[in-house]
């Protein structure tokens, strides 16, 4: 059973549309638990993505599926001629031919591309069936394959917030309290003692 990668977040229930994005996004189609057979597509910029079976190849499922979106890797999303060599993504490793399973066996979600000749659909997964049923057909009429790489940005990576060193407040706070106590109680007490001594001496 496949499990949806945490790069994806639910964007629409079946029959609705995911919000319009100004850039293409990674789309996934899965059950409400993000499990079972998962289908992948790339969305188009500035165009609503309809969440239904037709958008993913007229799939028929026993449960109502939902749509999930995530970020496409920037270098893939903005890919120019330098991203490919003979239509194959540079620096990516072939993991399967069409109609086989891409399984890099690294026990973590990786970047996977399915397609040929510079036309690819993206997924983030541990493994995935490498076929047009799962990815659609990004390049009709030619034999396709799957390629993988480790994500450039670790999945679930949250940039750490710099912590500004602080001086322990104990001494400083204690010092402030000492002066406060002196002003509130010490000086009046000294005045009271002085007055008592003055009246005793006067008698």
Swiss-Prot record:
Compartments (UniProt record): Virion; Host membrane
Keywords of the record: Host membrane, Membrane, Transmembrane, Transmembrane helix, Virion
Membrane-topology descriptor: Single-pass membrane protein
GO cellular component entries: host cell membrane; membrane; virion component
Transmembrane regions listed in the UniProt entry: 180-200
Species: Acanthamoeba polyphaga mimivirus (APMV)
Protein name: Uncharacterized protein L701
Highest taxon of source: Viruses
Paired cysteines (S-S): none
Predominant localisation class: virion
